[in-house]
Amino acid sequence: MTIYGLIAYLIFVTSSIASPLYIPVIPPISEDKSFNSVEVLVSLFPDDQKDYTVTSQFNNYTIGTKDWTINVLSTPDGLDIPLTNITYWSRFTIGRALFKSESEDIFQKKMSILGVSIECKKPSTLLTFLTVRKMTRVFNRFPDMAYYRGDCLEAVYVTMTYKNTKTGETDYTYLSNGGLPAYYRNGVDG
């Protein structure tokens, strides 16, 4: 039995020596296939927060209220365009958080991914990965992702838009946790 183990070991060692480990290298992306404008819009229902705080550091951007927190996170060496314009507003029980940035001369030349998390402050074990409803693939980038943890909101919608302002090309991903809230499905009177 040990002879078979020795043969398997020799095959493994010789095949490892003959074919060194292959690590693919992703070449830089050309300027016409890269973007220089990023926008992440998060819509929440029902929501009527008035006070919020904004925090940003190391490709992690956060808007927080007394009920929930929204994080937009990029890979550690990912997004070259920092999301500098971060705002929140609420109207008709729908809250919107906008993370945005645009640059004239900085283009995203390497593969990147954006992740969005919406988390209720009240502890909960409910975790929902938002479903991709629509997505275009113009630029070379990894697919976006988003999740919602908690039960303080009925509906969560996330739209991520990427644009090359020189060519006008636009790429976007639309994610949500479901259809319309029951309030709209059943009508105002129920």
UniProtKB/Swiss-Prot annotation:
<protein>
    <recommendedName>
        <fullName>Protein OPG209</fullName>
    </recommendedName>
</protein>
<dbReference type="InterPro" id="IPR009172">
    <property type="entry name" value="Orthopox_C13"/>
</dbReference>
<comment type="similarity">
    <text>Belongs to the orthopoxvirus OPG209 protein family.</text>
</comment>
<dbReference type="Pfam" id="PF07190">
    <property type="entry name" value="CrmD_SECRET"/>
</dbReference>
<dbReference type="InterPro" id="IPR010806">
    <property type="entry name" value="Poxvirus_TNF-rcpt-II_C"/>
</dbReference>
